UniProtKB/Swiss-Prot annotation:
Gene this protein is translated from: cdaR
GO molecular function, one term: DNA-binding transcription factor activity
Protein name: Carbohydrate diacid regulator
Superkingdom of the source species: Bacteria
Gene3D superfamilies assigned: PucR C-terminal helix-turn-helix domain
Species of the source: Escherichia coli (strain K12)
Length: 385
């Protein structure tokens, strides 16, 4: 029962519940004999010597008027030990004639012990949930599964050898108060942690949740399309009964040491890139954004600056962005002149003129594959797209 104890809230709940069973005052004492719950609020905090007798002798103690006069903080009544898993965790006392109360004592005690057991189980469930969340937070940072992580997982009944892929749920909690946002997050967490899903979920903050999903299907294969459908179904389902607006990004599936950490990084970057490129969308997938996600790690480094140089030259002479939009459309339509000109509502000669102008300004030959690739990569890195 490590971490659990009979506290004042639990004691007062027991008093409220049991006083509905029997019309007499009820006291609840902790394992030190102090009154921590009572129908007579003035008695809370007093040391109850009758409870000390119960705690020391481990049995029911009747207190009549004669005995009560010789004990501190005691009135006539019956005092029973409260046991949890065979251990005495407190005492419950009923005030009144012992002879009249004896037949109710066991019933009241049984009710109190059932409440204690329920409280302990809730505590264990909450503790288990916190430990699982901490494990998830460690796994998304770990480059390998250390013996300590493996032992931690085993104690929680989690198999770290099960392949997993990471999804990130980013929540817009700005429209809700803190309490409401947390309640909605916990509702979402509960929906994601049902046993049949076998997900590991951690609430990182009021705006982010991490989900470690089993990666392989029933045939032992990675099926990105199946995961896509599941994410889309989740978003549809949560729209029906939740107030939260949220986005989901799904990272890539990796194998080997540090696979979960790598999957988390791809999910994180997929979210960032997805919001930049498709702000109206609610779900983003690594497979759809693979190149810009992989290139994002270069951002800020000298390699990215070199790759961006041709496009930077184009920008200086393309104030209204017309040539860049033309270039992006050309690549989007697989460098096919007819499809590109139709999409832009321009004549093919106009398209050819613009492409020639782009070649002049960038110093690159758009008929050369390597030069095309340089410009395409530069566009992928361009934050002004």
């Amino acid at each position: 029962m490590a971490g659990w104890h009979l506290d004042t809230k639990m004691a007062q709940d027991i008093v409220a519940r049991t006083m509905r069973i029997i019309d007499t005052n009820i006291n609840v004492m902790d394992a030190r004999g102090r009154i921590i719950g009572s129908g007579d609020r003035e008695r809370i905090g007093e040391l109850h010597e009758g409870a000390l007798l119960v705690l020391s002798q481990g049995r029911v103690v009747d207190i009549d008027d004669a005995v009560a006069r010789h004990l501190h903080g005691v009135r006539q009544g019956i005092n029973l030990p409260l046991r949890l898993e065979g251990e005495i965790v407190g005492v419950i006392g009923l005030t009144g004639e012992p002879e009249n109360l004896r037949k109710y004592g066991e019933l009241v005690c049984m009710t109190a012990e059932m409440m204690l057991e329920q409280s302990r189980l809730m505590h264990l469930l909450a503790q288990d949930s916190r430990l699982r969340e901490e494990l998830v937070m460690n796994l998304i940072q770990a480059e390998e599964n250390t013996p300590a992580l493996t032992e931690w997982a085993q104690r929680l009944g989690i198999d770290l050898n099960q392949p997993r892929v990471v999804a990130i749920v980013e929540v817009d909690s700005g429209q809700l108060g803190v309490d409401s946002a947390m309640a909605e997050l916990q509702q979402l967490q509960n929906a994601l942690t049902t046993p049949e899903r076998n997900n590991l979920v951690a609430i990182v903050s009021l705006t982010e949740m991490v989900v470690l999903k089993p990666a392989l299907n029933s045939f032992g294969r990675w099926d990105a399309e199946d995961h896509r459908k599941r994410v889309e179904q989740l978003i549809t389902r949560m729209k029906e009964y939740g107030q939260l607006r949220f986005r989901v990004s799904l990272g890539n599936y990796f194998t080997g040491p540090g696979s979960i950490a790598r999957s988390y990084r791809t999910a994180k970057t997929t979210m960032v890139v997805g919001k930049q490129r498709m702000p109206e969308s609610r779900c983003y997938f690594y497979q759809d954004l693979m190149l810009p996600v992989l290139l994002d790690s270069l951002r800020g480094d000298w390699q990215a600056n070199e790759l961006a140089r041709p496009l930077a030259r184009l920008k200086t002479m393309d104030n209204n962005g017309l040539l860049r939009r033309t270039l992006a459309a050309w690549f989007r339509h697989n460098v096919q002149p007819l499809a590109t000109s139709k999409a832009l509502f321009i004549h093919r000669n106009t398209l050819e003129y613009r492409l020639n102008r782009i070649s002049e300004l960038t110093g690159l030959d758009l008929g050369n594959f390597d030069d095309r690739l340089l410009l395409y990569v530069a566009l992928q890195l361009d934050e002004e797209r």
